């Protein structure tokens, strides 16, 4: 098999919130692509040997000279180019066209009328009018617009407010689209991207789960040889897929450490040990560190501080176990491509605000002196799941809802105590069980329970009592950047509430969170 990463498609990032979505759409076609900052070095670009380039959108305006531009040498590369939104505008300006701020901005749905023939949009339409005009339903998000074409370009589509909504120089295979083909609101968006990537760029479509696994196994064996590898196994999707992949590649050379923090979901430790230890035969060192974590968290209520303490304590426990394993030479991690993109700071926003600390950011101590192995660092989450299924992991494990690294520690809105964790664990398990029973679990993106540190009066039998409040949260989202609260049936919520109040001692009231993201985040802390 040829190198899957030979001649990738490149996406140059101008800071759009949709840049990773472009890459995911391209990967869905079976095409390998990578994201780089818009100011990529020319030598690095040449070494990558791309088959084509997409210029992403971005929050800036090309009407200011100081704002980002594509490298000028890119337009002399001879490669097919597609500019999306800001990418189209900077292409237009840099090649001699004009862009101005528009009095009529376009945000949201727009009806697009195609102009004549273009290789990019030919025979792609949502409907055709009686006069033969082809129309597309697209998603716009722009305040500037191209007002004058660069030399050699023609108009390929228009909207009521943007007479130049798309442009093309067919001879140089350069294209610009003012709308966003990568979002699902543009109904034919995937076909448009596929036309550019596969038909115009002639990209290879060998990027499939089977080929990804084959290449990863070969690379792991080549890197590791006969040496042993250590993996921190959490039971999450990423570390589970890494465990299965490494086990297939190197068998008994893999050693896993599983840390029970006391902040896991109900029966989670037993499920992980059963699946990977007894069922798959992987060597797992299980550490019950509940007391250590609860002691470290005593008296702490600040969410950010809780995250840092949980992360620091995890590293201490893991380090202590790793130091006992003198034969280990490699440390495996479940780093995935979005982590790589963020840590490489490909975003054009230099001043980033820390919204929440992630417990595993920063890695393990240098004193371990281990070589790093990251076998899924080039995969998006949806690709990780596909690889997991191909490796034979259970569907319910691979498509389990996201669970935060700090676990229940950030779903207890107070000091973390064993009493609170036990209450929350049971309530959460009931919620998830009922979602499965009602066949709703896989229709929503994430669901969980939150422990609220307030007591509410309740009536149990003939007596009044004050007990704690549980809040249920369920959201639907495509990318977790924005989310809608899930409109679960009232009778379903009533059933869950009754079960929690009757079966979980210490709970007198259950509420349901109907906040979207934004303004709220998905997790409460």
Swiss-Prot record:
EC main group: ligase
GO cellular component annotations of the record: cytosol
Reaction catalysis annotation: XMP + L-glutamine + ATP + H2O = GMP + L-glutamate + AMP + diphosphate + 2 H(+)
Residues that coordinate or bind ATP: 234-240
Domain Glutamine amidotransferase type-1: 8-206
Gene3D superfamilies the UniProt entry points to: 3.30.300.10, 3.40.50.880, HUPs
The protein's name in its UniProt record: GMP synthase [glutamine-hydrolyzing]
